[in-house]
From Swiss-Prot:
GO terms for biological process: cellular response to nutrient levels; fatty acid biosynthetic process; nail development; positive regulation of cold-induced thermogenesis; signal transduction. AMPK is a heterotrimer of an alpha catalytic subunit (PRKAA1 or PRKAA2), a beta (PRKAB1 or PRKAB2) and a gamma non-catalytic subunits (PRKAG1, PRKAG2 or PRKAG3). Interacts with FNIP1 and FNIP2. Changing W100G: Abolishes glycogen-binding. Residues 9-36 have a biased composition (Basic and acidic residues). GO terms for cellular component: cytoplasm; cytosol; nucleotide-activated protein kinase complex; nucleus; protein-containing complex. Residues 1-43 are annotated as: Disordered. Changing N150K: Abolishes glycogen-binding. This is 5'-AMP-activated protein kinase subunit beta-1. The glycogen-binding domain may target AMPK to glycogen so that other factors like glycogen-bound debranching enzyme or protein phosphatases can directly affect AMPK activity. It comes from Rattus norvegicus (Rat). Phosphorylated when associated with the catalytic subunit (PRKAA1 or PRKAA2). Phosphorylated by ULK1; leading to negatively regulate AMPK activity and suggesting the existence of a regulatory feedback loop between ULK1 and AMPK.
């Protein structure tokens, strides 16, 4: 019972442990300080001990913060259209998204246009028109503490949900291996054989209302020979051919324009 410290030291030597030595101030020497394992879940508990110094703790926390920032997915860039309609010869765009460097705009008829991929969030911009800085009064503006007026734009994910849905649909339809231009069903190589009744079938009978061709009718004595009787509506927009006589073929067609009917005759020598 009286030699407890010596027994404890012997047990620690058998287990392979080494008791850290402390200096006169009560701290642990540099050679005996526990090592930091960066990927170990027990690293955070090391800083709760009194042996860890403040600069080392701040260094580890800064490293851990940078690691968390790198693990976050970057914001998706969204195509954003900038348009200047105020005229001019040379128009440039400058904003917080490109560190206020001048970007030339492309002329489109009377307008100047640029399409940029911007991350989601709030962005300020301005136009440089013919050597003078200006803003678009028709777009939202913001005024700084120094009195500078800039245009402001909000790039939101919700504004592109329709385009994202269309992109997903196009990706789903991009695989054309499952598509076929032929209708479903079995196919064979047997030739088509027409039935006897189909082979000797007579042409369809001419409808009876088309037999009354107004060109074949005789006009009465009291009628103007240059005028024809009013045709039936079923006779319109049909091409009629007269039997060839004296080497001439006659074609006719009747059309209606509002309340008038016009019959055209074409004579073609054969």
């Amino acid at each position: 019972m009286g030699n407890t410290s010596s027994e404890r030291a012997a047990l620690e030597r058998q287990a392979g442990h080494k008791t850290p030595r402390r200096d006169s101030s009560g701290g642990t020497k540099d050679g005996d300080r526990p090592k930091i394992l960066m990927d170990s879940p027990e690293d955070a508990d090391i800083f709760h001990t009194e042996e860890m110094k403040a600069p080392e703790k701040e260094e580890f926390l800064a490293w851990q913060h940078d690691l968390e920032v790198n693990e976050k997915a970057p914001a998706q860039a969204r195509p954003t259209v900038f348009r200047w309609t105020g005229g001019g010869k040379e128009v440039y765009l400058s904003g917080s998204f490109n560190n206020w460097s001048k970007l030339p705009l492309t002329r489109s008829q009377n307008n100047f246009v640029a399409i940029l991929d911007l991350p989601e969030g709030e962005h300020q911009y301005k136009f440089f028109v013919d050597g003078q800085w200006t803003h678009d009064p028709s777009e939202p503006i913001v005024t700084s503490q120094l009195g500078t007026v800039n245009n402001i734009i909000q790039v939101k994910k919700t504004d592109f949900e329709v385009f994202d849905a269309l992109m997903v649909d196009s990706q789903k339809c991009s695989d054309v291996s499952e598509l076929s231009s032929s209708p479903p069903g079995p196919y064979h190589q047997e030739p088509y054989i027409s039935k006897p009744e189909e082979r000797f079938k007579a042409p369809p009978i001419l409808p009876p209302h088309l037999l009354q061709v107004i060109l074949n009718k005789d006009t009465g004595i009291s009628c103007d020979p240059a005028l024809l009787p009013e045709p039936n509506h079923v006779m319109l927009n049909h091409l009629y051919a007269l039997s060839i006589k004296d080497g001439v073929m006659v074609l006719s067609a009747t059309h209606r324009y509002k309340k008038k009917y016009v019959t055209t005759l074409l004579y073609k020598p054969i």
